[in-house]
Regions:
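Beta1/beta-strand and adjacent pyrophosphate-binding region of the FAD-binding site
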Residues: 1-11
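Active-site substrate-recognition segment that forms the wall
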Residues: 6, 15-23, 45-46, 81-84, ...
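Glycine-rich FAD pyrophosphate-binding loop
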Residues: 22-42
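Dinucleotide-binding Rossmann-like beta1-alpha1 core, especially the glycine-rich loop
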Residues: 46-126, 130
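Helix-loop-beta segment of a Rossmann-like dinucleotide-binding subdomain
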Residues: 80-93, 108, 117-161, 259-263, ...
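Core beta-strand elements of the Rossmann-like FAD/NAD(P) dinucleotide-binding domain
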Residues: 185-193
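C-terminal catalytic lobe of FAD-dependent flavoproteins
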Residues: 292-368
Length: 368
């Protein structure tokens, strides 16, 4: 008899978990998603964690492992360059001393992360040669292993892959009963294992079980632009100092963003002020941009914890319910490894997660 695994949420964690579980013929997997406000669909999509200034070594190990999974998954599912491309990342610094320090950090971190690939210190002119769109380039450090990913397309491809095997998808909102019952529009549904990969919505979802998840929502907005010129598939992405990320996607699509808005709750309305701010940031890098080239403004809701670290695993008092949340703006980087670890746990019951996170009780508490 097949074991029933139900996943709530089809963002990066839910989709990757479903992908790995689809390889097990002894499992039947069902996924539910309301399809509103998902962070994965509205993310900037740079995979390049190695030069981060974050001091949390658990997070860094998780992000490094997540970045390393992408080539394997992309090859297995035969995704194209429009979904994922290891075109390299350029991180800029105006001050020569800061640039040298960044270059030194990159060389040090490559010793334990060979997937970083080639590392080069580039002049402003050399940066412009790599990214011809730039009209005001700054010197930077190039990491060839850096990549761009379209989070929406990536998750979609994984779900399509899993649907050909053991995945059934449902669109709709679900809720939990006080004992963890799964309640849908079609009534209560049974499961052997339930995975809550709902990001910022974990807190309200767990409240009926009298569990308070220490997560808060953060609004993120970005702009997509369609430019008249085209460029090669291997144009790097730019993480410019003091500005929004600048991401040339395949051919003529440019993404600028994203914002980090802590006071907007679950609001998904496009802000014209934020749109203007994002455009102004892009304009500082490419003076030829025009407002009418904006084709879309994307809005999503991320989940953050008080220490800006993700958490995942079984509920302390219910090993049949797994949760994952708090991925923040690096969710596309850490999400693949979290999804793989959750899938491994479902299949083996074993885990060794201490190297990646604090105890899950750090982020969950009983309601009064």
């Amino acid at each position: 008899m097949q074991k029933q695994v139900t996943i709530i949420g089809s963002g990066i964690v839910g989709a990757v978990t479903a992908y790995y579980l689809s390889k097990d013929p002894n499992l039947s997997v069902t996924i539910y998603d309301e399809g509103i406000g998902q962070a994965t669909k509205n993310s900037a999509g740079i995979i390049s964690p190695w030069l981060s200034k974050r001091r949390n070594q658990r997070w860094y190990r998780l992000a490094k492992a997540g970045a390393a999974l992408y080539p394997e998954i992309v090859t297995d599912t035969q995704m194209g360059y429009s979904v994922y491309q290891q075109a390299g990342t350029i991180v800029t610094r105006a001050d020569p001393d800061d640039l040298q320090a960044l270059y030194k950090l990159a060389l040090e971190r490559r010793q334990s992360a060979p997937q970083m690939g080639t590392i080069e210190k580039l002049s402003a002119e050399a940066v412009q040669e790599r990214i011809p769109l730039l009209t005001a380039p700054q010197p930077g450090v190039f990491v060839s292993g850096g990549a761009r990913v379209d989070g929406d397309k990536f998750a979609h491809n994984l779900l399509k892959y899993a649907e050909k095997r053991n995945l059934i998808r449902h669109k709709g909102k679900v809720r939990l009963g006080d004992q963890g019952q799964l309640l849908t529009v079609n009534g209560q549904q049974s499961y052997d294992t339930l995975i809550l990969a709902v990001g910022a919505w974990l807190k309200p979802l767990l409240l009926p079980m009298k569990i308070i998840a220490g997560v808060r929502p953060q609004k993120g907005q970005l702009i997509e632009m369609q430019l008249p010129e085209t460029w090669a598939d291997d144009v790097p992405v730019s993480m410019p100092e003091g500005e929004r990320d600048f991401i040339p996607f395949t051919r003529s699509k440019l993404v600028v963003g994203a914002t980090h808005e802590n006071d907007q709750g679950y609001d998904l309305q496009v802000s014209s002020l934020v749109e203007d701010d994002l455009f102004a940031s892009g304009l500082k890098l490419d003076a030829n941009l025009t407002k009418d080239q904006i084709s879309q403004v994307k809005v999503g809701t991320r989940a953050y914890t008080r220490d800006f670290a993700p958490f995942f695993g079984p509920l302390p008092d219910n090993p049949h319910i797994l949760v994952a949340s708090g991925l923040g703006s690096s969710g596309l980087t850490t999400g693949p490894m979290i999804g793989k670890l959750l899938a491994d746990y479902v299949q083996t019951g074993a885990h060794d997660w201490d190297q990646y996170q604090l105890p899950i009780e750090t982020y969950l508490e009983a309601a009064d």
